[in-house]
Amino acid sequence: MISMASWQLLLLLCVATYGEPLAKVAPLVKPGSTGQQSGPQELVNAWEKESRYAESKPGSAGLRARRSSPCPPVEGPAGRQRPLCASRSRLIPAPRGAVLVQREKDLSTYNWNSFGLRYGRRQAARAARG
């Protein structure tokens, strides 16, 4: 009896989640009157017959095409479309008139943490003492 109640509760939760009316998915039938109990296979067959489930199967024609770029397209010159954020650079622009600082080419002069990120420069005085 407890397993029957838990099966009905599970079915009710699934139906409530997907928004299907209960009578459409599993019609209420008294098991004593017909001599048969509706098993899980009958419920699966009823579920597969639904049009929404058939559309979401892989290989169906109802699949939506995804856009390749998260940026909205913008009309450019000559009617061509280009993504809005394609022209933006990921680099931080240097302020105008500022002198560019040259980066250290020798990476062995930096301290590295356990994640492979550098966090400071090694000092020559410590290396000579140590």
Swiss-Prot record:
**KO phenotype (gene knockout):** Animals are viable and healthy with no apparent abnormalities but fail to undergo sexual maturation. Mutant female do not progress through the estrous cycle, have thread-like uteri and small ovaries, and do not produce mature Graffian follicles. Mutant males have small testes, and spermatogenesis arrested mainly at the early haploid spermatid stage. Both sexes have low circulating gonadotropin (LH and FSH) and sex steroid (beta-estradiol or testosterone) hormone levels.
- Note the SS bond partners: 71-85
Q: Name one Pfam family in it.
A: Kisspeptin
Q: Where in this protein does the record say Tyrosine amide is found?
A: 119
Q: Does the keyword Secreted apply?
A: yes
Q: Provide this UniProt record's keywords sorted from A to Z.
A: Amidation, Cleavage on pair of basic residues, Disulfide bond, Phosphoprotein, Secreted, Signal
Q: In which tissues is it expressed?
A: Weak in all tissue types with highest levels in lung and 15- 17-day embryos. Expressed in areas of the hypothalamus implicated in the neuroendocrine regulation of gonadotropin secretion, including the anteroventral periventricular nucleus, the periventricular nucleus, and the arcuate nucleus.
So which residues are the signal peptide here? 1-19
Question: What biological process terms from GO does the record include?
Answer: decidualization; G protein-coupled receptor signaling pathway
**Is Transmembrane helix a UniProt keyword of this protein?**
no
Identify the stretch(es) annotated as Disordered. Answer: 49-82
Q: Which GO terms describe its cellular component?
A: extracellular region
Record region (Essential for receptor binding and receptor activation): 110-119
- Modified-residue entries (Phosphotyrosine), positions: 110
Cell compartment(s), UniProt: Secreted
Purpose of the protein: Metastasis suppressor protein. May regulate events downstream of cell-matrix adhesion, perhaps involving cytoskeletal reorganization. Generates a C-terminally amidated peptide, metastin which functions as the endogenous ligand of the G-protein coupled receptor GPR54. Activation of the receptor inhibits cell proliferation and cell migration, key characteristics of tumor metastasis. The receptor is also essential for normal gonadotropin-released hormone physiology and for puberty.
Family, as annotated:
Belongs to the KISS1 family.
Among PANTHER family, the record links this protein to: METASTASIS-SUPPRESSOR KISS-1 (PTHR16955:SF6)
Protein's name according to its UniProt entry? Metastasis-suppressor KiSS-1
**What is the organism of origin for this protein?**
Mus musculus
Gene symbol of the encoding locus: Kiss1
